[in-house]
Amino acid sequence: MSRSALIENVTAMLADAGFSVSDRCATRPKSFDVAARRGSDVVLMKVLVNIDAFDAETGAEMRRLGTYLHATPLVVGLRTRDEDLDPGVVYFRHGVPVFNPDTAMELFVDGIPPLVYAAPGGLYVNIDGDVLADRREDERLSLGQLASELGVSRRTVSKYEDGMNASIEVAMRLEDLFGGELTAPVDVMDGAEDVRDTDPTPDDPEAAPEDVPVLSVLARVGFEVHPTVQAPFKAVGEAGAGHDRLLTGHSAFTEAAVKRARIMSSVGEVTHTRAVYVVDEAGRESVDDTAIVEREELANVDDSEDLRDLLADRGDLQEA
């Protein structure tokens, strides 16, 4: 299957699951393919046939954008260079959860979250330590007796009851002994932080020299500016403790600029984020819901409220 066909399938699946899905980010380079929202759940989705193509730079940008846009970065893919991705298993690449389309279908359409995740050494599951301790005590088994049944140490059983995750083989033996409901699903929409050590959000990249004049104005009027490298916009600006967010792009007002402005409008609608595109000269005030602002107008803005007023008449204001 081609990547384009796979993106279409995943996008259709998200729509069937009740998500509002943005236009595809048909620009290069691009850190994500679509943004999607269902209620309070927002995802930034990258779709790949071979997930080995997902590099560290893209992973870092998706994680940054997830933080700034209050979204979960996810990758859906079919395989690695060596093998297909197993259904029902969450993998990780550069801190981003990865799974195959069948797992995505179960999660988003059927409401069945995955139970298994891949980590160095094999496949693992979340063990509900409190339930395990209760079941062991109900069966009047000591830590040592259960350890003998499982072929592990007494200390390891104690760690399972304290919340340590177990290999899938141990989990299957536990369920043979005590029945089901010992395992807890992987919380994919929270970035699967329950099953992995969470690294801090990667640092922002340096702004490209040609972006500095526009981004410095946003910083001057009170926005915390986060430059991007691979997104269809140049930066995400935050003001008011992150409640006032702004996707920002700039270039000459060409057909390519209109295309980017449309994508920014669509992503902004899904993520409840305002979008502005800065140009030298323009014969219009908006492209869809992306405000078009001339550089001279932007230079005359005094503060974030002044900028908000300027944008209010140009496209619909997306509320965070």
Swiss-Prot record:
- Which SMART domains does the annotation name? HTH_XRE
InterPro entries tied to this protein:
Arc_TR_HTH, Cro/C1-type_HTH, Lambda_DNA-bd_dom_sf
In its UniProt record, a GO molecular function of this protein is: DNA binding
> Could you tell me which cysteines form disulfide bridges?
none
Q: Which domain of life is it from?
A: Archaea
Q: Which UniProt keywords apply?
A: DNA-binding, Transcription, Transcription regulation
Cited NCBIfam families: PRK04140.1
Lineage of the source organism?
Archaea, Methanobacteriati, Methanobacteriota, Stenosarchaea group, Halobacteria
Which HAMAP family does the UniProt entry name for this protein? HTH_type_cro_C1
Q: Which Pfam families match?
A: HTH_3
Please tell me whether the keyword DNA-binding is annotated for this protein: yes
Name the record gives this protein: Putative HTH-type transcriptional regulatory protein VNG_2112C
Which residue numbers delimit the DNA-binding region? 143-162
Limits of the HTH cro/C1-type domain: 132-189
